[in-house]
Each structure stands twice: as C-alpha cells, then as structure tokens.
Amino acid sequence: KLEGDICVENTLGACMFFKKKDFIDIGLFDENFFIFFSDDDLCRKIKKKNKYVIQVFESKCIHSHGISKVKNIFEKIYLREHYYLLDKFHYFHKSDNHKDMMKNIIDKKNNYLIKIFFSLITMRFKKVVYYFARYTAILKFNNFLKKLS
C-alpha cells in the first residue's frame, strides 16, 4: 500500500486544486469538451508545462456523480455515449500520439450499423440507442475533421 504524496499521470477533475495563476497558465478548460476527458486534458497540459500532478495522500474528496436531470433512459444512454465518444475523439486528436486508436474506433462505424440492425430485430432498444449514439458521434467527429482540412 502506498503512503504519502505521489506524482500521478491523471486524477479526477472533481478533486483538482490549482493556484489561479497556474490554472490560467495551462490554458484553463478546453471548451470543446462536453464533460468527459477534461480532467485528462488538464493533466496533459500540466505535464507539458513541466509541472506535476500530485496526489495528496491525506486528502479526501467526495464526488457525487451520476446525478442527472434526464429521466428518459434512452435519452440518458444516447447523451452519455454520444458525448463520451466525441470527447474521447477530441482528446486523442489533441494528443497526436493516438491516431491509430482513433482510426480503429472510426473504422467501427459500419459495425455499429450492423449492431443497430440486429439490436432492432431482437428488440434490444437500449442497445439500439447505445450503438446509434456512437455511430452519430463518429459522423460528427468526421465532419469536424473535414472542416479542419
């Protein structure tokens, strides 16, 4: 068991504390992230500035996650999966060294269409929404990449 303060690669954004000057110096939050991966992005930017992400052993943080105003389960699944994948694409696109991983996910686009079809036939509607959300995230990210070129 580890004890004492240690340097870590990433930490949960809900538990981060910065001096205001340092937070401004790293460029604040990237507004292109919906909610996911913003903490990973902050940690990456901290390391780029030759600073450290330190986990303080004695610290305690309670993060009440999972509280959502969206009551419709299908809408909740769609929003979670769609924005999770979009944020994941954005994070890996920014980090440059994950191009192969991004390509593998984008290549799954046609597989998602097949899975949507079979999930419809078997009446697994939550899966239909799940795969549709991921499919639309891929389409949206492809449009984003086209605008950049």
Go through the PLM ranges and name each one.
Residues 26-31, 52-54, 70, 77-83, ...:
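Membrane-proximal envelope and lipid/glycan-remodeling enzymes
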